[in-house]
């Protein structure tokens, strides 16, 4: 699975949220100023080439659907992120965000609750 560019990732997030869509639907999801239709169409073509979306021809346009689940993408690239930036230590990652004041004490409690629930299952 290839890593997506920032633009591709943004478009892919819209496709995941829409579940199936035309390029015009994706363009409509952007805030003003919206990118040109042709730019979004080009990005979607790249996503199709990379295997992230499937296209079904309907008349003279295409209906796009995700070919890769969002959870699968997250699992693959978050694992790489933790490996590359935090020596494969999730503890180091959480510590970093806590020190940078990106996580509150309540956030950390929620994380602990999630971990404990995961152990029970």
Regions found by a protein language model. Give the residues of each.
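Short helix-coil-helix linker/hinge
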Residues: 2-7, 20, 87
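Short, locally clustered residues in the helix-turn-helix/winged-helix DNA-binding domain
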Residues: 13-20, 98
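Amphipathic alpha-helical dimerization/coiled-coil segments
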Residues: 77-120
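Short acidic, hydrophobic short linear motifs in intrinsically disordered regions
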Residues: 21-30
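Pre-recognition alpha-helix immediately N-terminal to the DNA-recognition helix
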Residues: 9-14, 25
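Short, cationic-aromatic polyanion-contact patches
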Residues: 4-7, 58-77
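Glycine-centered, phosphate/nucleic-acid-interacting loop/turn motifs that mediate DNA/RNA or nucleotide
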Residues: 51
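Short, hydrophobic-biased segments on the C-terminal half of alpha helices
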Residues: 41-45
């Amino acid at each position: 699975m290839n890593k997506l560019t920032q633009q591709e990732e943004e478009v892919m997030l819209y496709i995941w949220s829409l579940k199936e869509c035309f390029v015009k639907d994706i363009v409509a999801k952007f805030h003003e100023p919206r990118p040109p239709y042709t730019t979004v169409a080009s990005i979607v073509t790249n996503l199709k080439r990379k295997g992230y979306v499937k296209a079904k021809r309907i008349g003279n346009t295409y209906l796009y659907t995700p070919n890769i689940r969002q959870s699968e993408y997250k699992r693959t690239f978050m694992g790489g992120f933790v490996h590359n930036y935090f020596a494969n230590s999730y503890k180091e990652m959480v510590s970093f965000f806590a020190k940078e004041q990106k996580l509150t004490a309540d956030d950390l409690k929620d994380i602990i609750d999630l971990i404990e629930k995961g152990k029970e299952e």
